[in-house]
Design a protein with these regions (language model features):
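The C-terminal output helix
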Residues: 138-140
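A charged, aromatic-enriched C-terminal amphipathic alpha-helix characteristic of glycosyltransferases
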Residues: 88-91, 95, 105-136
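Acidic, glycine-centered active-site loop in nucleotide-sugar glycosyltransferases
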Residues: 45, 59-61, 71-88, 113
């Protein structure tokens, strides 16, 4: 399996890398990939969780591709926000990759959508203000 992931032509397997190195790798990437398990047990366990890796991918500057079961909360979020190329059926993977190969502007479009999503929904100052407003509203 590692040979498939690390063919040194199209894909590179880095193993464990530091957060600083991850940023450098994202800078050199066309796609930031977020993958969740399709195993039923793991899918059910993680279906309500929102991985911090999603935010990392959205901030990467690359187009985001999410390959996850459709019951996953993070996948639903990315799909609703149209912030990522979303694949919930592994049978769609090859067709999606061929579409990207034939229309590379898809990656530019989704990199922009990821950036717009980060600005709209993941601004720490804006989120802090919203939380403070909620506390004030419910404290009265």
């Amino acid at each position: 399996e590692k040979e498939i992931l690390d063919n040194q032509i199209y894909t590179y397997y880095h193993g464990l890398i530091s957060p600083e190195q991850l940023i450098k790798e994202y800078d050199n990437s066309s796609i930031a990939l977020h993958v969740e398990s399709f195993d039923l047990k793991n899918s059910l366990i993680t279906r309500l969780s929102f991985s911090t890796k999603i935010t990392d991918c959205l901030q990467s500057g690359a187009a985001v591709m999410a390959i996850c079961p459709e019951i996953n909360a993070g996948f639903k979020y990315l799909l609703e926000e149209d912030a990522a190329i979303c694949i919930s059926n592994l049978d769609e993977l090859e067709t999606t990759l061929r579409n990207i190969f034939n229309e590379p502007e898809i990656l530019t479009d989704y990199a922009l959508k990821a950036r717009e999503c980060i600005i709209k929904n993941h601004n720490p100052l804006k989120n802090k203000e919203m939380i403070a407003d909620d506390f004030h509203k419910y404290a009265q």
